[in-house]
């Protein structure tokens, strides 16, 4: 079964404003700033997948857009704010998806974008960053090393540093997914969200717990990159020395305290899943939905696979958050 412990206490829902950094009015306003190509993404029931998993399953598809992930919902807000402030350049650290999204949003608004990424990031993600005319610097080591380098460059060049999850705009952009879920006519009782730095989990969780508090928000993270999940259960920041997972998009080691505080308020549970279940999820999404996804997008399916009894009789929504995947690696996972 999925590795989990008794859920930590969550915020009091439906009785007042949740105490987080996020704001519902700003999230509603964000829809007027984000390019419509990233909004109102498909959500539909997948009966074939549901039969295999033993529950009703719907997917929220965040990959049918120019950057193949949900990240541009946040970078659209970031880039808009920076141009309003008269900024001309920006730098970020990224495992691939944020860098691609910021490059797209920045180019649209005339911002010079620099991305610092781990050298071992999937080649497909790095190639797409280059294709968007961003300056790309590769570093040895993991995402945390890239984050340190990006901060150093920002200070040295005097440009704005964009930090995913810490910059609340990245969370509030992702939160527009929650608005769309809350507006769906179909009834669902559980949402499974990939957990890395926490932008999507806190954003979507905040909206759901504000508007439809009965929906259970479950965050899912690989057992090989457990820092945020362990922090959620311990209710304090827990760091790790390394990560070991194919889900590079969620492989952080140093949770951000402010983001953890938000997550403690809006998430009902956080679970860890094994690599074998992530790979099985990738395979099932291809076979039963026709979707080619990156490992992070299969975490929700993996969570159901590891704890089937928990989800029997439920209507589960899993957010398909990205499809920027190295094809050689994908073929190894799917056809092994």
Model regions: which residues?
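PLP-dependent amino-acid enzyme catalytic core
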Residues: 2-336
